């Protein structure tokens, strides 16, 4: 594993072998990165998320497998609405 300058790796995060973390990468708590990847500069990974592919510079990712954070949170909002609608009487 290689780490660039200014990286932040929070508790219980894992990085598999031969992975390269570029400068200013942030891995939040309980996140993971699979092996043989190049994590681009400025990438941010949300807690409890996992990266399976190389990233683009400045990417903000969430989920497992990781997707753009904005898309991930939209999906979670839709799932919440579906759950509420399921219990609503017609």
State the predicted function of each range.
Residues 59, 64-90:
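Terminal amphipathic alpha-helical/low-complexity segments used for targeting or macromolecular assembly
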Residues 1-68:
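Structural signal for interior beta-strand "rungs" in well-ordered beta-sheet cores
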């Amino acid at each position: 594993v290689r780490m660039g300058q200014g990286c932040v790796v929070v508790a219980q995060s894992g990085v598999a072998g031969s992975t390269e973390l570029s400068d200013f990468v942030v891995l939040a708590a309980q996140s993971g990165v699979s092996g043989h990847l190049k994590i681009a500069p400025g990438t941010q990974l949300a807690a409890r998320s996992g990266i399976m592919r190389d990233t683009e510079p400045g990417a903000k990712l969430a989920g497992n497998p990781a997707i753009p954070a904005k898309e991930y949170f939209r999906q979670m909002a839709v799932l919440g609405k579906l759950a509420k609608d399921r219990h609503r009487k017609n």
